[in-house]
Amino acid sequence: MKLTSHDIIRKPVITEKSMAAMAENKYTFIVHMAANKVQIKRAVEEVFNVKVADVKTMRFEGKTKRVGVHIGKRADFKKAVITLAEGSSIEFFEGMQ
């Protein structure tokens, strides 16, 4: 399956923990489940025009939820923590700190 850079990066994670990590030049994104670290690195460098130093990924299994007698499951997702090279920053997040 051919993934474009915009297919790989789904959305940013905006939580208290991820905002605190921005002080250390680390940014968190929800990414495509099939994307590997090399693809994620290339996508972030292409979309945000920055230099990536490190990529850490985590896979999460969706929780089983129940509403009345109906049982369902939330979607699985993959999260990537991107460490940028010294002196780089993503402008999209600058106003949020």
From Swiss-Prot:
It comes from the Bacteria. The keyword Ribosomal protein applies. Keywords: Ribonucleoprotein, Ribosomal protein, RNA-binding, rRNA-binding. GO terms for cellular component: ribonucleoprotein complex; ribosome. InterPro entries: Nucleotide-bd_a/b_plait_sf, Ribosomal_uL23-like, Ribosomal_uL23/eL15/eS24_sf, Ribosomal_uL23_CS. One of its GO terms (biological process) is translation. The keyword Ribosomal protein applies. GO terms for molecular function: rRNA binding; structural constituent of ribosome. Transmembrane segments: none annotated. Part of the 50S ribosomal subunit. Contacts protein L29, and trigger factor when it is bound to the ribosome. HAMAP family: Ribosomal_uL23_B (MF_01369_B). One of the early assembly proteins it binds 23S rRNA. One of the proteins that surrounds the polypeptide exit tunnel on the outside of the ribosome. Forms the main docking site for trigger factor binding to the ribosome. Belongs to the universal ribosomal protein uL23 family. This is Large ribosomal subunit protein uL23.
